[in-house]
From Swiss-Prot:
GO terms for cellular component: chloroplast outer membrane. PANTHER family: ENT-KAURENE OXIDASE, CHLOROPLASTIC. Heme binds at residue 448. This is Ent-kaurene oxidase-like 5. It comes from Oryza sativa subsp. japonica. It is found in: Membrane. Keywords: Heme, Iron, Membrane, Metal-binding, Monooxygenase, Oxidoreductase, Transmembrane, Transmembrane helix. Belongs to the cytochrome P450 family. CDD domains: CYP77_89. InterPro entries: Cyt_P450, Cyt_P450_CS, Cyt_P450_E_grp-I, Cyt_P450_sf, KO_chloroplastic. It comes from the Eukaryota.
Length: 503
């Protein structure tokens, strides 16, 4: 599974943000820019600022521009105007106060086809979104569902630790690949929550063969991520949309076909297990009930299930891997966390019930989400009514893009923002409101539905990993902080030396 992640990883939620540059769909330019438009970044005729974003890490470029043009400015991508927001204050104004004017998402062609706008993270706010979110909250992400799956989540962490201990016992002196072990178990947890079992293999009729769990992951996660960032130049120049783009269309249709084939095979398998009374209650049961009451079509059911399977992996993987990297890089902070765990839990394994009594663990999580936000840039939204942001006129027809990375690097909001310092969330200078200055899970009505589960899994995992093992970076890895293109996934998987505590 490591080979898959080396090329790309993450669920539809991260995939949507990974497509953020492509998501600046060209629309009819605003007729009237108003009397007080945001500052504009100089660009070239026709293409605007597209040539300045070719490094595929737009969040870094946006943040650099904010030093010159301020927390809000306008760029051009082809025929479209995009207002980029780089401060938490202005971002929350857009997401909460002005939500009614800029709630519609604009998607690139690839993401639009792959999602058909029938996914929770992609659909616009309306009846379908509310129905779909209600079902996933009841099945997986709500309070009662979280209690139901608590033992499953904690068993997943125990399985990761068991695998790590075995690898250390076999070769105690060589660094091991943390991501490979962790992702396998995370994907297994996702399959249990969504389908009722950790699927080892499934027969896919369209392929004419049985495929392994690793290939299921490849089709449902890696291929989808690779597809949605596939550029289609017609997104930027809508007046040329009548021209064919055969290579793009072939990639998208092939990816959609393979995804649908695997998902339909998994759904068929689970329907058979449900009929035999073998399956535990999971997300698919709630979706089937919604389908039977005519709220969902078969295709919508399949898309919602595919989204949830992939989404359960991305945020937790990114956050946990970065947290363990920072703790291994900063042994003094690792020991601080270890001492806190010993004082609170003694020799007992950390559980979700212990989390409220572990303030430094909470600080480690929030600081990791701030510095390494799983979604560096939120998907573009469309302004459908004239509005204002930070006192500037933003006319209908404009698009709004929130640079989460830039918000978290804002020197007016954070002291030494480039440093990983959990202590900023502790002590006399810390205010509870500081936690909400991070935008890792969005804000307002579209706050990420899976935030509580992501926090619970990541916190228990981080605590248990530090509680049982001493973490040291592989030699030479102390400066490997680069990310994979549009995402926050570490470009280089975390390789660490582990030493069991007390040995």
């Amino acid at each position: 599974m490591e080979s898959l992640l080396a090329a790309g990883a993450g669920g539809i939620g991260v995939a949507a943000a990974a497509a953020v540059v492509a998501a600046t769909l060209a629309v009819v330019p605003p007729k009237d820019r108003g009397n007080n438009p945001p500052p504009a970044v100089p660009g070239l005729p026709v293409i605007g600022n597209m040539h300045q974003l070719k490094e595929k890490k737009p969040h870094h470029t946006f943040t650099k521009w904010s030093k010159t043009y301020g927390p809000i400015y306008t760029i051009k991508t082809g025929a479209s105007s995009v207002v980029v927001l780089n401060s938490t204050e202005v971002a929350k104004e857009a997401m909460i106060e002005k939500f009614s004017s800029i709630s519609t998402k604009k998607l690139p062609k690839a993401l639009s086809v792959i999602s058909r706008k029938n996914m929770v993270s992609i659909s616009d706010y309306g009846d379908f979104y509310k129905m779909a979110k209600r079902n996933i909250m009841l099945a997986i992400l709500g309070f009662n569902a979280q209690k139901h799956f608590c033992d499953t989540r904690e068993r997943m962490v125990s399985n990761v630790l068991s695998s790590l201990h075995k690898l250390v016992a076999v070769d105690p002196h060589s660094p091991l690949n943390f991501r490979e072990v962790y992702t396998t178990e995370l994907f297994g947890l996702s399959l249990i929550q969504n389908l009722g079992e950790d699927v080892c293999s499934v027969y896919v009729e369209e392929f004419g063969r049985e495929i392994s769990k690793e290939e299921i992951f490849h089709v449902l996660v890696h291929e989808i991520l690779s597809c949605v960032v596939e550029p289609d130049w017609r997104d930027y120049f809508p007046y040329l949309s009548w021209l064919p783009n055969k290579s793009f269309e072939t990639i998208v249709s092939s990816t959609e076909f393979r995804r649908d084939a695997v998902m339909n095979a998994l759904i068929k398998r689970q329907k058979e297990r449900i009929a035999r009374g073998e399956a535990r209650i999971s997300y698919i049961d709630f979706l089937l009930e919604a389908k039977n009451s005519t709220q969902l079509t078969d295709h919508q059911l399949m898309l919602l299930l595919a989204e949830s399977i992939a989404a359960a992996v991305d945020t937790v993987l990114v956050t946990t891997e970065w947290a363990m990297y920072e703790l291994a890089k900063n042994p003094d902070k690792q020991e601080w966390l270890y001492r806190e765990i010993r004082e609170v839990c003694g020799g007992k394994a950390v559980t979700e019930e212990d989390l409220p009594r572990l303030p430094y663990l909470d600080a480690v999580l929030h600081e990791t989400l701030r510095l390494h936000s799983p979604v560096p840039v939120l998907p573009t939204r469309f302004v459908h009514d004239d509005t204002t942001l930070a006192g500037y006129d933003v006319p209908a027809g404009t698009q709004v893009m929130i640079n989460v990375f830039g918000c978290h690097m804002d020197e007016e909001a954070w002291e030494s923002p480039g440093e990983w310092s959990p202590e900023r969330f502790l002590g006399e200078g810390f205010k509870l409101a500081d936690r909400y200055k991070t935008l890792a899970f969005g804000a307002g009505r579209r706050t990420c539905a899976g935030s509580q589960q992501a926090v619970s899994i990541a916190c228990v995992a981080i605590a248990r990993f530090v509680q049982e093992l001493q973490w040291t970076l592989r030699e030479g890895d102390g400066d490997k902080e680069d990310t994979m293109q549009y995402t926050a996934l570490k470009l280089h998987p975390l390789h660490v030396h582990l030493k069991p505590r007390g040995s």
